[in-house]
């Protein structure tokens, strides 16, 4: 999608790309290696793209949600392609989806480069990772 729209934005000299990553794109979580790798790739790609196009009038915002109370796990697919149909306790206890949407809209309207979305431990992990990556590693490693 970015490949399709970016040339038009560059031609106009303005635009705003918003993409969703995850707290897992900044903090590795045990038993979610593939997901974390994919979300780290999203962060890296759009950080680099931002550096390339910001002086051309293109804004790039990366939305970094933690747990948000949605049915995303229930509606996801299992490895065999069947409906997973099971709630995820972390998501169920997460930020209200309307509140999350308000945080995202506010961040986008203010042109924020990164928009953290969530409450509690995942937001604490983002903050702590900047101060003590080793501490966050030990915390996530020991989380069951």
Model-based region annotation:
Residues 27-33:
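Active-site loop immediately N-terminal to the catalytic Tyr-X3-Lys motif
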Residues 111-143:
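A transmembrane-helix-recognition feature enriched in membrane-embedded lipid enzymes
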Residues 22:
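Residue(s) in the substrate-gating loop at a strand-loop-helix junction
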Residues 2, 38:
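Active-site helix of classical SDR
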Residues 4-13:
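A short helix-coil junction within the Rossmann-fold of NAD(P)-dependent oxidoreductases
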Residues 40-47, 51, 102:
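Conserved active-site helix of classical SDR/Rossmann-fold NAD(P)-dependent CH-OH oxidoreductases
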Residues 7, 51-55:
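Alpha-helical segment proximal to the catalytic Tyr-Lys
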